[in-house]
């Protein structure tokens, strides 16, 4: 199939195979996106990816407006990211996102950030669709157009499991969920778990951790007014595993950092 590239008036670029699996957009790293070292922060990197996913989905009428008409909403269940380096404040970058074929209950969306030809970070994510009315998962069938050419491979980043049992593990902080943490699903936004988790550490400690790989799993929803307790453990492989536990002591969010 011959592929051409479309360019919209706002600078969006996307591969055209009757609207291909890829979507690209230039992104300047603004001050509000940066950490204390004037580099793109990890939460802002996750925000960038989610925003790109929304823009791409909107081309298929499964962005916020299209899903609202169906009374559905997207949820991310897992993300794994590898960081080579973070861009600096006011750098111009280009982000690309692309999708893999969906199965019955979930779909994979991948992403990468570039500075010219240099890949700065990349990731994989697993998504599902839920019904506002029932609160249950919705089958993926029919959401994506049949004519998409899925020809972009996923990054070579394994998706693993993180154990939910943090009994007796070190407590590193607590966080009470506020109104500003809530998204259109009525629960805590995914990226705000990451912000709350990293907020358990000082800027100096985050610098010392020098995070190159991060895997997160969103286990269940949390709501305004609830308090999360963050606990950590260090497996023999040298990684740092963190769990956010609700007031019943059950893990709602899991992360592995290295």
Each model region followed by its residue ranges:
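Hot-dog-fold acyl-thioester-processing enzymes
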Residues: 2-76, 124-126, 131-210
């Amino acid at each position: 199939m011959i592929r051409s590239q479309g360019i919209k008036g706002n600078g969006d670029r996307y591969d055209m195979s009757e609207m291909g699996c890829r979507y690209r957009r230039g992104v300047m790293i603004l001050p509000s996106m940066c950490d204390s070292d004037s580099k793109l922060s990890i939460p802002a990197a996750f925000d960038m990816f989610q925003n790109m996913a929304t823009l791409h989905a909107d081309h298929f009428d499964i962005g916020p407006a299209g899903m609202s008409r169906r009374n559905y909403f997207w949820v991310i269940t897992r993300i794994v990211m590898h960081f080579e380096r973070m861009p600096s404040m006011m750098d111009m970058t280009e982000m690309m996102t692309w999708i893999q074929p969906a199965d019955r209950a979930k779909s994979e969306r991948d992403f990468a950030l570039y500075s010219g030809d240099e890949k700065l970070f990349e990731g994989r994510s697993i998504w599902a669709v839920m019904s506002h009315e029932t609160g249950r998962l919705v089958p993926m069938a029919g959401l994506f157009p049949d004519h998409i050419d899925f020809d972009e491979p996923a990054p070579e980043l394994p998706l693993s499991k993180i154990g939910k049992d943090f009994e007796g593990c070190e407590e590193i902080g607590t966080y009470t969920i506020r109104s500003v943490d809530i998204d259109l699903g009525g629960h805590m936004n995914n990226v705000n778990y990451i912000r709350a988790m990293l907020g358990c550490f000082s800027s100096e400690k985050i610098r010392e951790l020098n995070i190159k790989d991060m895997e997160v799993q969103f286990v269940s929803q949390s709501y305004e007014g609830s308090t999360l307790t963050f606990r950590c453990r260090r497996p023999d492989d040298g990684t740092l595993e963190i769990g956010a536990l609700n007031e019943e002591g059950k893990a709602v969010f899991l992360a592995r950092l290295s």
